[in-house]
Amino acid sequence: MDKKLLFQPIQIGKLKLRNRMVFPPMNTNYSNTDGSPMELMMDYYARRAKGGAGLVVVESTTIDPTSRNHGAQSQFSDTSYIPLYSKLVDKIHRYGAKAAIELTHFGADGTVSSGGEEPAPSDVTSRGAQYSVHAMTIDDIHAMQEQYVQAVVNAKSAGFDAVTFHAAHGNIMPEFFSTLYNKRTDWYGGSLENRVRFAREIVEMARKAVGPAFPLIMRISGDEYIEGGRTLDETVEICRILEKAGIDCFDVSGGIQASYIFSIAPYNLPGLHGFMMPSAKAIKEAVNVPVIGVGGVRDPELAEKFLEEGYADMIALGRSFIADPDFGVKAMEGRSADIRPCLTCGNCFNEICCDRILTCTVNPETGREDDFKGIEEAKEKKKVLVVGGGAAGMESARVLALRGHKVTLLEKNDHIGGSVSAAGVP
């Protein structure tokens, strides 16, 4: 095996991963109307497992059917969802990856679907959503904690190897952490210890319910990137508390709903690639469990650099695996030049925000995995002439060559690309 750290096994608690490449949770809108996973979702995640990811984390999945954040919101609110999620897990396992699922309640960042008010730590609306909210009572808090624990138990019953608690990007857990939204004066507000209590009790209850061997991961924003929001120093202390409560791994991201623009690094500013890694490093130095680093890491060499320099123990490569589902395999085979790069154009994010299904500008396979089962070798090899080196001509030539034909591509200009070249001019 390659000696690079990126391809070396690692453990989260007692769970052994084949490598350190993580496909992190990102919304797809590939759910049925009841929140259960469509076959499309299953094929999508399985394809990233086939492409070499060591851990595949299924997208943000709500524990409560009344909590929604986008169009086709995935749910795991009761045991009726177990059979379909079990099928999804089996498809991921088929290719040697481990499967986790991210559990959440969106709190003030949810969208009102029934004319009611969203539950929140206090009567403070989200700066990113601006929906009506109501301050949760102690009974409300305890009921939601039970929902979280039941979802963890259900996930384990479905065969997931781990769960991730979503405490990044704005939802109920970070709302309790934050003095921007948490104005409570009881045991769940005020001091840092009190503001962490909601999440800490969930972790402790979940640990008791599923036992010591089932990994619990916490995805958390290192810095909220907003004036008055939580800073890295405070997040480090939160992680220390949650580690003692039973968290086995931290997945360190950044931003909240109101500062989401900072969650995606622009491609034309290479200096920002991996811009959240310092947050991961600070948390890694403060805890004794593995840390996943994230933030615009688009190539295996940069991922390896962050591992070697001690920024993180694993690297989340979300949009890299969306743009090229074989990112992992190509990286392990030393074919970095063959990896189709993510442009960080934001199309995937825009589609979700507009309640459409996830697609990718550079990868037509995304969202159509069932239609792209693989390019079969042609039974009869031919010599093929393709006239025109624009996008369509290049793609035709590429696929024909992969099928085994001998292809000649003709272009009247002194370069290929067609109108794509013109579109690339600043």
Q: What are these model-predicted stretches?
A:
Residues 1-407, 412-415:
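Flavin-dependent oxidoreductase catalytic cores
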Residues 418-426:
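N-terminal Rossmann-like dinucleotide/flavin-binding domain of flavoprotein oxidoreductases
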